[in-house]
Structure formats: C-alpha cells, structure tokens
C-alpha cells in the first residue's frame, strides 16, 4: 500500500513539479500551478490519491472496486478518479496513472509555460489509453 512518503517521492520525481499542503492537510502536487495529483488519508488508515484521467480511463476506472469519480471534481464534469480503498490499483499502476495525469495536465499548459518549465518539446510518449488499446489488439 502506497504511503505519503512513496506518493510524495514519486510525484516529486516528475518534471517541473511543486508541492503544497492545503485543503485541510491534503498533499497537492502541481505542474505549472495546475493540480495533477492529490493525496490525503481516508479515516487515517488508507492514503486516498486523486488524479486526472482521459475519458477512456475514466470510463474504465470509475466503477472498479476501491476507485470512484473524485468527489467535487468529477461532479463538475472534470475527469478525475479517486483511489480511496482496497483493492484499488497496485502501487505500480497507481504510479502509471499519476504519471499520466502529469502528462495530461502538462499538455494543457500553454506552449510558453511548457517552455518556461523545460517541458517543451514533449517527447512522443504513448498515453495509457493507447497502451490499453494495443494490449486489447495484441
């Protein structure tokens, strides 16, 4: 099970990230002042992690055990998932989705901001959705 230390270390390893504790103790990770991941203890037992996803990933993940549309964010039509209980995702899969969230948010920044942060030009990285499609075809 992922800990705050694991979560913060992984998010901090992604390019051009910043960390702030806000919203009643949530660990909020941003790229270019835009949130890509939020970590917060649920009932002081389980680290809940909220991350942005594509429409395809949202449809795949929203009804999986231990996952749900993120409260507040998803209700406004934004595609965010919260990993809140077991079984949820493995730590490895959770890291992939956090990295994908970072990629999605980074791509939404202006080119000017991407350049300022050293994120532009992006290398062609296959999205999680593309990887899922290749697995289904193969």
What feature does the model see in each segment?
Residues 1-138:
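Charge-dense, helix-prone N-terminal extensions
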